[in-house]
Amino acid sequence: IWREYIYHLQHDDNGKRYSTSESYISALKSLQKFLGKDAIKGFNISVVEIQKWKDCMTNGVKGKDGNIEGQISESTIGIYLRSCRTIWNVCRSQGYLLDVTYPFSNKKEKHLVSIPRSKVKKKVYLKREQFTELYNVFVNKNYPDTWKKGYAERAHYSLGLFLAQYLCNGFNLADAARLQYNDYYFQTGKRAFLFNRKKTADRSSNDSEVVIPIIEPLQVILDEIAATPSRDGYVFPEIFNGVTSEKERSKRTAEENSNIQDRVTKICHDVPGWGKAIRPSGTWCRHSFATNLRNAGVEKTYIDESMGHSTNSNDMTNVYLDTYPLEMQMEYNSKLLALDDESTQRDELISKLSKLSNQELLQLLNKAV
């Protein structure tokens, strides 16, 4: 049943939950590693075996050289046990294990396996002044001459994606990869995106819809690294690079996430000279979006809804747009960067000039003279 569950995650609905299957695969491998592949026959399993597995993950086991090996973090143990609990519940729903004591508990109870709670991660973020500095690096292409040939171009693209994640309401790269120039984009005069968060799309319908106002700095980035707008075309097609299977898409997204973190980290260290503790990732973008808007005095309801957090509304998008019309969204998201009007206008002018041909630029110069 466990393997069957993994199969369905990987293949149902064109494999759109492929990435979810990875934790179930790892959990099953861990169970077999510590208890042995043939230790459990059929449904002959109880709280004793599950507790033994947890103890092995917690304390490790002696290896061939006598050293302790196999210890994993409490958070990973929690992930594996929750995967096992899901499979146990599937078995019960199919009529199996009904006469076996339910082994799991979310708190420490005698004779039951307690599942560690996920630790609250320290929320790391960059201040809006730091994002503004990175944005100026992007606009001016201020990269070290000492970098190897071709690296600056790759780093520039990665920095653009990183900034786009921040300015696009802190969405993750899986959402960026699926972002399209859909009807809503054209209906708003190319001033906003509408998309469904991949993480919550399976659990809700309207609640996962997110509107992204395209403020001017975001447009500057799009002009530089995004695809030319075409109806239903991908905004950032290079992330998937044409692959269609969810397995390959998941792999491509993970690779691009790694590239972005490595390259943006190098930019942070080599250009503004920030400390080695700063290693920005997509998670930083999400935390930074929420933190910087909150510090700028933007109301929490807007922040939550613009990040796709669940609400009780039956039609979240319409309520959201009634409460926060596009102009107000533009105003709020403009607080994400510390740009004055003059620098914003300069960036807009640079963006427009970059689209002109050499002949058009020459005509402008002649007129100026």
Feature names for model-found ranges:
Residues 345-369:
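Short, low-complexity, charged amphipathic interaction modules
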Residues 178-224:
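Conserved tyrosine-mediated DNA breakage-rejoining catalytic core shared by Y-recombinases
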Residues 78, 102-173, 177:
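Basic, Lys/Arg- and aromatic-enriched nucleic-acid-binding interface segment
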Residues 131-132, 213-276:
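Active-site/catalytic core of tyrosine-dependent DNA strand-transfer enzymes
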Residues 89-100, 165-189, 301:
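Short, charged phosphate-coordinating catalytic segments
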Residues 142-151, 231, 261-305, 309:
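Short, basic (Lys/Arg/His-rich) helix/loop patches that form interaction surfaces
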Residues 199-201, 307-346:
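Catalytic-site neighborhood detector that most strongly recognizes the C-terminal catalytic loop/helix
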Residues 5-19, 29-120, 141-148:
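N-terminal core-binding DNA-recognition domain of tyrosine recombinases/integrases
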